[in-house]
Regions:
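Nucleotide/phosphate-binding catalytic cleft detector across ATP-hydrolyzing
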Residues: 1-59, 78-79, 88, 102-103, ...
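Phosphate/pyrophosphate-binding loops at sites that engage ATP/ADP/AMP, CoA/4′-phosphopantetheine
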Residues: 171-183
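Catalytic P-loop NTP-binding/switch module of NTPases
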Residues: 91-103
């Protein structure tokens, strides 16, 4: 073979070796073989995107509890990745802070009654801070009525405010990765 130019596109991912060895050993102790160790953004890309999407070009936003990964694929491969140090846990923390409640209560409110889209009916709906069976235990939430219920509209407002901050960061990340595709 003869060539004037040789090129290669590679992605180098750094990881602490100890956790990888621990996971590999745990899998092997279960009498299974580890075929490969793959970075989370690459695994998410293969799990969530079709080969055609990865080929044509797409952005993938992966929301985690502590971080949000923004990755861009084109020509079938990962072109770039930005990790934002914000995630769904920040939404939970904002709810806990806004209403002066415990984190587990905030997580339950987010999962059971939360939404990323406000609705006019939210202003009429009062939601219980405590889980069924736990009524009148723990502190009364800020802005709550005598039955420790809060307006759903206030919960949605806290959630959408946090998500707006996160979306600003996602938008910045996409710009830094050169992604100019249509949104939606």
């Amino acid at each position: 073979l003869h060539a004037e130019r040789l090129g290669v596109d590679i992605h180098v991912m750094l990881a602490d070796g100890a956790p990888i060895r621990n996971i590999t050993e745990a899998v092997q102790n279960a009498h299974l073989q580890v075929e490969a160790v793959v970075g989370s953004p690459i695994a998410a890309g293969y799990a969530c995107l079709s080969p055609e999407e990865r080929d044509l070009g797409v952005a993938l936003v992966e929301f985690g509890a502590e971080v949000t990964n923004v990755s861009v694929y084109a020509s079938g491969m990962l072109l770039g990745l930005v990790t934002i140090p914000m995630g769904s846990g920040d939404v939970t923390d904002a709810i806990a802070s806004a209403f002066g409640i415990r984190r587990f209560q905030a997580e339950r409110l987010k999962c059971v009654h939360g939404s990323a889209i406000a609705s006019p009916s939210d202003h009429r709906e009062m939601i219980p801070v405590n889980a069924p069976g736990d009524e009148m235990t723990g502190p009364i939430a800020r802005h709550a009525d005598d039955k420790n219920r809060i307006p759903r509209a206030e919960l949605i407002s806290v959630i959408t405010e946090q998500l707006a901050r996160l979306m600003e960061e996602v938008s910045r990340a996409l710009k830094s990765l050169g992604f100019t595709g249509q949104r939606g």
